[in-house]
Amino acid sequence: MKKTPLLNSQVSQAVATIGHFDLLTINDAGMPIPNDERRIDLAVTKALPRFIDVLETVVTEMEIQKIYLAEEIKMHNPDQLKAIKGLIAEDVEIEFIPHSQMKEYLSHPLNKGNVRTGEITPFSNIILESNVTF
């Protein structure tokens, strides 16, 4: 059995294939994720699993250089924004973009996976951009 915190095989496989500048998204239940091979649906019911719990686990296995968040999270979900900032290393760049642009990244060529959680709070979506470990 795997010794690290991330047990889901699909999420683990997506992280394992990531190279420098590649992307992984973690999303709330309402994000319109394309139904393709990159879709990883973890949602069981409302709020299960929570976005922040999935993010907390993924960051243990992924070297991140930059994150993208919806500009709208500042006004509509400041508690989630605070929680995200608490999990992300201080040297990681944060870029705020319109939510409509976040949706475009779901099909971006560098995107290795779109994780759907059971999160039901607004704008609980993040794009993680990979760094190298050396």
From Swiss-Prot:
Its EC number is 5.4.99.62. It catalyses: beta-D-ribopyranose = beta-D-ribofuranose. The keyword Flavoprotein does not apply. Substrate binds at residues 28, 99, 123-125. It is an enzyme of class 5 (isomerase). This is D-ribose pyranase. Pfam families: RbsD_FucU. Belongs to the RbsD / FucU family. RbsD subfamily. The keyword Flavoprotein does not apply. NCBIfam families: PRK11797.1 (NF008761). Catalyzes the interconversion of beta-pyran and beta-furan forms of D-ribose. Pathway: Carbohydrate metabolism; D-ribose degradation; D-ribose 5-phosphate from beta-D-ribopyranose: step 1/2. The active site is at residue 20. It is found in: Cytoplasm. GO terms for biological process: D-ribose catabolic process. Keywords: Carbohydrate metabolism, Cytoplasm, Isomerase. Homodecamer. GO terms for molecular function: D-ribose pyranase activity; intramolecular lyase activity; monosaccharide binding. GO terms for cellular component: cytosol.
